[in-house]
């Protein structure tokens, strides 16, 4: 895979008008937050943007500003498809018909397994989250950030770092989080509460089924649970 090119991505964002954004199957906070942050920012500079979540809005992230602008099905053919937080082309959560007109595929991701499937790639495995890359992209491209966009970025970064508990929490990650909180007055405690405490009945039932499979070995250092297709 070629080296990531900020300039190529920025050129695409500046040159074209019609964008469709998507992320991986069963999206998490980083995928959804990255889609919202980049999509809302492009909207603010007059671009036509469609943010697609075919599986609908996960209850956990229903609080995010702009989430109501996402759609489950595309309504137009884009000039550019922006893939966020998706390591493989096959996992990109977008209908195949969007590719029939050969739009430019831009791949923005942080997974080390990403093979650079886009025509333009911005893949940074050292980044803790795709939201971290999107933040840097918005700054480099001089694209706007406001409170809703900052909330999406913070949620993206916080969820992929375990709210700054994982080993991928670097000084840059903490610096970005601090900027988002200080400059846009976003509420970290409320975001953490919504992410960790908002659960659908279906997710709670699934958790109960998985916990019911818990087994502990004779050696108490080992325990395991399992999740199978029937549970989901």
Model regions: which residues?
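Short alpha-helices
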Residues: 108-178
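Active-site cofactor/cluster-binding pocket
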Residues: 65-120
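Glycine-rich, phosphate-binding/catalytic loops in enzymes
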Residues: 38-39, 98-101, 123-124, 175
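Solvent-exposed alpha-helices and their adjacent loops that cap or buttress functional pockets
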Residues: 12-13, 74-75, 97-100, 114-115, ...
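Short, motif-level signal for alpha-helix interfacial/capping segments enriched in acidic residues
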Residues: 3-8, 87-88, 137-140
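An acidic intrinsically disordered interaction segment
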Residues: 1-7, 98-105, 125-134
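Hydrophobic helix-and-loop "lid/oligomerization" segment in the mid-to-C-terminal part
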Residues: 2-25, 31-62, 77-80, 159-232
């Amino acid at each position: 895979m070629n080296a990531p090119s900020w300039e190529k991505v920025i050129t695409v964002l500046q040159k074209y008008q019609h964008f469709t954004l998507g992320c991986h199957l069963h999206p998490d906070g980083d995928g959804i937050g990255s889609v919202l942050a980049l999509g809302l920012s492009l909207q603010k500079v007059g671009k036509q943007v469609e943010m697609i979540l075919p599986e609908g809005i996960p209850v956990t992230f229903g609080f995010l500003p702009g989430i109501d602008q996402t759609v489950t099905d595309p309504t137009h053919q884009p000039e550019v498809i922006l893939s966020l937080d998706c390591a493989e082309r096959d996992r990109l959560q977008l209908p195949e018909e969007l590719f029939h007109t050969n739009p430019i595929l831009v791949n923005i991701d942080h997974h080390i397994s990403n093979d650079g499937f886009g025509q333009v790639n911005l893949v940074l495995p050292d980044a803790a989250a795709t939201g971290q890359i999107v933040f840097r992209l918005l700054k480099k491209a001089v694209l706007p950030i406001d409170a809703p966009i900052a909330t999406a970025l913070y949620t993206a970064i916080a969820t992929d770092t375990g709210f700054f508990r994982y080993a991928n929490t670097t000084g840059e990650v903490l610096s970005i989080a601090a900027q988002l909180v200080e400059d846009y007055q976003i509420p970290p405690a409320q975001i953490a509460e919504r992410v960790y405490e908002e659960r659908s009945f279906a997710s709670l039932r699934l958790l109960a089924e998985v916990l019911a499979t818990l087994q502990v070995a004779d050696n108490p250092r080992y325990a395991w649970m399992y999740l199978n297709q029937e549970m989901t």
